[in-house]
Amino acid sequence: MANHKSTQKSIRQDQKRNLINKSRKSNVKTFLKRVTLAINAGDKKVASEALSAAHSKLAKAANKGIYKLNTVSRKVSRLSRKIKQLEDKI
């Protein structure tokens, strides 16, 4: 247990932030899963729309410091490449 009021407060703040960050990360993962499911189903239009929504969520998460910018870029790039491969197959 923390001995100082300031450390007690910082522990409370950390716990609060941890819950918020978990929620935001979960929300982003849900959007990424929608893109992946659309890609696996072979539906290019739905996948593109889902990617645009997921990209927005990822950018906001990066802005909040939940994900690093390179991580977001990598995720978007990989999903975009998979959608592009769907176009090539058709």
Swiss-Prot record:
Binds directly to 16S ribosomal RNA. SUPFAM superfamilies: Ribosomal protein S20. The keyword Acyltransferase does not apply. Keywords: Ribonucleoprotein, Ribosomal protein, RNA-binding, rRNA-binding. The gene is rpsT. GO terms for biological process: translation. GO terms for molecular function: small ribosomal subunit rRNA binding; structural constituent of ribosome. InterPro entries: Ribosomal_bS20, Ribosomal_bS20_sf. Residues 1-10 have a biased composition (Polar residues). The lineage of its organism: Bacteria, Pseudomonadati, Pseudomonadota, Alphaproteobacteria, Rickettsiales. Residues 1-25 are annotated as: Disordered. One of its GO terms (cellular component) is small ribosomal subunit. This is Small ribosomal subunit protein bS20. The keyword RNA-binding applies. Belongs to the bacterial ribosomal protein bS20 family. PANTHER family: 30S RIBOSOMAL PROTEIN S20, SMALL RIBOSOMAL SUBUNIT PROTEIN BS20C.
